Amino acid sequence: PLYVPEQPSTLKRLLHLGSFAVSSFFPLMAQRRWRPDRIIGVVPTLFCTPGMRLLAKLSGARTVLHIQDYEVDAMLGLGLAGKGKGGKVAQLATAFERSGLHNVDNVSTISRSMMNKAIEKGVAAEKVIFFPNWSEIARFQHVADADVDALRNQLGLPDNKKIILYSGNIGEKQGLENVIEAAERLRDEPLIFAIVGQGGGKARLEKMAQQRGLRNMQFFPLQSYDALPALLKMGDCHLVVQKRGAADAVLPSKLTNILAVGGNAVITAEAHTELGQLCETFPGIAVCVEPESVEALVAGIRQALLLPKHNTVAREYAERTLDKENVLRQFINDIRG
């Protein structure tokens, strides 16, 4: 059983993550029968690391803790732990994270800045492995226009308007309230804001859009795996939106597929962060704007819409660095080390 709160709060989120750790513990222990060589734990959620370490001890396996998000840093950066870093919840969370990071054989993560953060948290540099999010590049190479048109018709999106697409989790760390504000400012232009996905913040955003009478904003459920290439190719501008303070703790996995399809993305990130540096190092790969600024977001959308719809800089970067087979081959070599 898994506890999924209808209206998330800090306590309810902790209960949600804890219930997942408890419910997965017994199936995890059953795996000791075949004595794995490596056990990989994925964060979120840190709550599962004690079970992973126990299984490793029972089976003699080596452990890898893979960090997708620094969930403690994200919690503190977004003010979800009460009194900030000095609060009791924050202190307990930080201690729990430290224990998890320091008691595994390797720590892997998805960006260079997140690798540096692991080292700052006391992990030995030789134990830290680069394991970026990948993309199945071939899936996004030849997306048929007919598939895009069919999906567009299925979703009821008009042909005469450009699509501003957000596809992914709809939670607190994204700061999607600014997308509502941007849609309101652009309501008289031939644009549709398509918000695709699920999450604890979706109902609130739908209510905000309804209260403001935003006919240029539509919400859709998460689309199927098979529909993803057509969905991403459909977008004239992709939104990769996060609040200030989250850009190095959380590197959006959605960006890899946007780059693979050659999409034009507007990324909210400070210049010094991993995402900000990506945009500076590879000019034209995306439009980087200040987080939590409606004015910057609107300007970024306008800029992205002036670009050719197929972004060759993004596409070529994805082919060089994000191909699934290459990423997995390197990771396997690293953990065999």
Regions found by a protein language model. Name each.
Residues P190-G197, K202-P229:
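Nucleotide-activated donor-binding/catalytic signature segment of Leloir-type glycosyltransferases, i.e.
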Residues P158-Q174, I180-A183:
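Conserved donor-binding/catalytic core segment of Leloir-type glycosyltransferases
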Residues M29, R35, F47-P50, L54-S59, ...:
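Membrane-proximal helix-turn-helix segments that form the acceptor-binding/catalytic region
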Residues P291-E292, A296, L305-I335:
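A charged, aromatic-enriched C-terminal amphipathic alpha-helix characteristic of glycosyltransferases
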Residues Q174, P221-L259, A265-E280:
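Nucleotide-sugar-dependent
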Residues P5-K12, W34, S59-T94, A138:
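Acceptor-binding helix/loop patch of EC 2.4 sugar-transfer enzymes
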Residues S113, W134:
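Carbohydrate-associated surface elements
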Residues Q141-L157, T312:
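A short helix/loop element that forms part of the nucleotide-sugar donor recognition site in Leloir-type
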